[in-house]
Design a protein with these regions (language model features):
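Extracellular/virion structural assembly segments
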Residues: 1-146
Length: 146
């Protein structure tokens, strides 16, 4: 059952647009964000380099999430596709939550979309390239909201 699996901007993606996670998408989301580079300095008078290792911070990350889209017929598919583009992609911000991690909200910026693969009128597979600007901001309410 694919409804209740994925929420985008607070909406059940399957019930709203017929979209559900591809088999690789969850592991992509769960991949830890990289750290920012540590502050370091190479002194000419010392061997190696000095690295300040305390207080590591997360860096932004770019991810490519694979999705599947399905509908009962080609007209519904085209309608759902147009609505998804208008309601989500055109606004540029996606807040993604899954039933597998119910207390984690991924706040991402839409960058681009791949061409549909396996397009068969009522179903398709596509990938969204997203930027997660602050991987530490994954609570129910954004820490940047006033």
């Amino acid at each position: 059952m694919t409804n209740g699996q994925l929420y985008i901007n607070g909406k059940d993606a399957y019930l709203t647009w017929g979209i559900f996670l591809d088999e690789t998408a969850l592991s992509t989301l769960m991949t830890p964000a990289p750290n920012k580079e540590f502050i370091s300095n190479k002194y000419r008078s010392k061997d190696g380099k000095s690295v300040i290792k305390h207080n590591p911070r997360l860096d932004e990350r770019e991810i490519t999430l694979a999705f599947n889209m399905t509908a009962k017929d080609s007209d519904t598919f085209m309608t759902n596709y147009a609505r998804f583009c208008e309601e989500v992609l055109a606004k540029g911000e996606l807040v993604i939550r899954t039933r597998f991690q119910p207390n984690v909200w991924y706040r991402c910026i839409y960058l681009s979309c791949t061409q549909f693969s396996q397009f068969v009128r009522e179903m398709a597979k596509f990938s969204l390239k997203l930027n997660e600007p602050d991987p530490s901001d994954r609570g129910e309410t954004s820490k940047y909201t006033s």
